[in-house]
Swiss-Prot record:
GO cellular component: plasma membrane
Topological relation to the membrane, as annotated: Multi-pass membrane protein
Keyword Transmembrane: yes
Protein name according to UniProt: Uncharacterized protein MJ0796.1
Alphabetical keyword list: Cell membrane, Membrane, Transmembrane, Transmembrane helix
Transmembrane segments: 14-34, 48-68, 84-104, 109-129
Taxonomy, superkingdom: Archaea
Subcellular location: Cell membrane
Amino acid sequence: MMIDNISNFDKVRAVVVAILLYIFIILVVDGSISSLIGKYITYPSDEYHIIEFYDFIHIIGFLLSLSISTYFSSKDIIKDFAKFFTIFFGITFILGITLFLGLTFFENHIPSMRGYTTLMLFFFLLNLFKKLDKITN
Protein backbone atom coordinates (compact mmCIF):
# COMPACT_ATOMS: atom_id res chain seq x y z
CA MET A 1 0.00 0.00 0.00
CA MET A 2 1.13 3.55 -0.70
CA ILE A 3 0.36 4.83 2.77
CA ASP A 4 2.69 2.26 4.34
CA ASN A 5 5.69 3.96 2.68
CA ILE A 6 5.14 7.11 4.75
CA SER A 7 6.73 7.23 8.20
CA ASN A 8 4.61 7.65 11.32
CA PHE A 9 6.24 11.04 11.96
CA ASP A 10 5.11 12.27 8.53
CA LYS A 11 1.59 10.98 9.15
CA VAL A 12 1.38 12.77 12.51
CA ARG A 13 2.87 15.92 11.01
CA ALA A 14 0.28 15.87 8.21
CA VAL A 15 -2.56 15.56 10.73
CA VAL A 16 -1.20 18.36 12.92
CA VAL A 17 -0.68 20.66 9.93
CA ALA A 18 -4.22 19.89 8.70
CA ILE A 19 -5.72 20.72 12.11
CA LEU A 20 -3.74 23.97 12.39
CA LEU A 21 -4.68 25.02 8.85
CA TYR A 22 -8.32 24.22 9.54
CA ILE A 23 -8.34 26.30 12.73
CA PHE A 24 -6.62 29.16 10.90
CA ILE A 25 -9.13 29.07 8.03
CA ILE A 26 -12.09 28.96 10.40
CA LEU A 27 -10.86 31.79 12.62
CA VAL A 28 -9.79 34.13 9.83
CA VAL A 29 -12.71 33.59 7.47
CA ASP A 30 -15.43 33.43 10.14
CA GLY A 31 -14.11 36.56 11.84
CA SER A 32 -13.65 38.62 8.71
CA ILE A 33 -16.94 37.60 7.11
CA SER A 34 -18.87 38.20 10.34
CA SER A 35 -17.49 41.72 10.59
CA LEU A 36 -18.35 42.47 6.94
CA ILE A 37 -21.93 41.21 6.82
CA GLY A 38 -23.31 42.09 10.24
CA LYS A 39 -25.60 44.82 8.92
CA TYR A 40 -27.02 42.61 6.15
CA ILE A 41 -28.79 40.20 8.52
CA THR A 42 -32.24 41.76 8.21
CA TYR A 43 -34.62 38.97 7.20
CA PRO A 44 -35.54 35.99 9.41
CA SER A 45 -34.12 33.60 6.80
CA ASP A 46 -30.75 35.36 6.93
CA GLU A 47 -29.92 33.73 10.27
CA TYR A 48 -30.40 30.29 8.74
CA HIS A 49 -28.48 31.23 5.59
CA ILE A 50 -25.50 32.45 7.62
CA ILE A 51 -25.43 29.05 9.33
CA GLU A 52 -25.39 27.42 5.88
CA PHE A 53 -22.46 29.64 4.94
CA TYR A 54 -20.56 28.60 8.05
CA ASP A 55 -21.29 24.97 7.14
CA PHE A 56 -19.76 25.68 3.72
CA ILE A 57 -16.67 27.22 5.34
CA HIS A 58 -16.27 24.31 7.75
CA ILE A 59 -16.72 21.56 5.13
CA ILE A 60 -14.66 23.06 2.31
CA GLY A 61 -12.10 24.47 4.78
CA PHE A 62 -11.60 21.02 6.28
CA LEU A 63 -11.18 19.36 2.90
CA LEU A 64 -8.84 22.14 1.73
CA SER A 65 -6.63 21.90 4.83
CA LEU A 66 -6.55 18.11 4.58
CA SER A 67 -5.49 18.18 0.93
CA ILE A 68 -2.83 20.86 1.55
CA SER A 69 -1.25 18.94 4.42
CA THR A 70 -1.38 15.70 2.42
CA TYR A 71 0.28 17.43 -0.52
CA PHE A 72 3.20 18.66 1.58
CA SER A 73 3.79 15.40 3.42
CA SER A 74 3.35 12.70 0.78
CA LYS A 75 5.00 11.31 -2.32
CA ASP A 76 4.17 9.72 -5.66
CA ILE A 77 0.55 9.14 -6.62
CA ILE A 78 -0.87 10.39 -3.32
CA LYS A 79 0.87 13.71 -3.92
CA ASP A 80 -0.75 13.91 -7.37
CA PHE A 81 -4.18 13.32 -5.82
CA ALA A 82 -3.51 15.92 -3.14
CA LYS A 83 -2.30 18.49 -5.68
CA PHE A 84 -5.42 18.11 -7.78
CA PHE A 85 -7.74 18.35 -4.78
CA THR A 86 -5.82 21.29 -3.30
CA ILE A 87 -6.41 23.21 -6.52
CA PHE A 88 -10.04 22.04 -6.69
CA PHE A 89 -10.89 23.01 -3.11
CA GLY A 90 -8.90 26.23 -3.32
CA ILE A 91 -10.89 27.37 -6.33
CA THR A 92 -14.13 26.17 -4.71
CA PHE A 93 -13.31 28.06 -1.52
CA ILE A 94 -12.43 31.32 -3.29
CA LEU A 95 -15.43 31.14 -5.65
CA GLY A 96 -17.77 30.33 -2.76
CA ILE A 97 -16.64 33.28 -0.66
CA THR A 98 -16.73 35.60 -3.69
CA LEU A 99 -20.22 34.39 -4.63
CA PHE A 100 -21.43 34.78 -1.06
CA LEU A 101 -20.06 38.29 -0.59
CA GLY A 102 -21.14 39.43 -4.06
CA LEU A 103 -24.71 38.24 -3.60
CA THR A 104 -24.84 39.61 -0.05
CA PHE A 105 -23.77 43.10 -1.10
CA PHE A 106 -25.85 43.03 -4.30
CA GLU A 107 -29.11 41.71 -2.80
CA ASN A 108 -28.68 43.30 0.66
CA HIS A 109 -29.40 40.05 2.46
CA ILE A 110 -27.65 36.72 3.04
CA PRO A 111 -27.94 34.15 0.18
CA SER A 112 -28.27 30.42 0.74
CA MET A 113 -25.07 28.41 0.18
CA ARG A 114 -26.68 24.95 0.50
CA GLY A 115 -26.94 24.36 -3.25
CA TYR A 116 -23.39 25.53 -3.95
CA THR A 117 -21.94 23.33 -1.19
CA THR A 118 -23.88 20.28 -2.38
CA LEU A 119 -22.86 20.90 -5.98
CA MET A 120 -19.17 21.22 -5.08
CA LEU A 121 -19.22 18.03 -3.01
CA PHE A 122 -20.90 16.26 -5.94
CA PHE A 123 -18.18 17.47 -8.33
CA PHE A 124 -15.54 16.42 -5.80
CA LEU A 125 -16.89 12.87 -5.69
CA LEU A 126 -17.25 12.80 -9.47
CA ASN A 127 -13.62 13.84 -9.95
CA LEU A 128 -12.44 11.45 -7.25
CA PHE A 129 -14.07 8.49 -8.96
CA LYS A 130 -12.65 9.55 -12.34
CA LYS A 131 -9.15 9.71 -10.85
CA LEU A 132 -9.56 6.33 -9.17
CA ASP A 133 -10.84 4.83 -12.41
CA LYS A 134 -7.74 6.08 -14.27
CA ILE A 135 -5.49 4.46 -11.67
CA THR A 136 -7.18 1.07 -11.81
CA ASN A 137 -7.17 0.91 -15.62
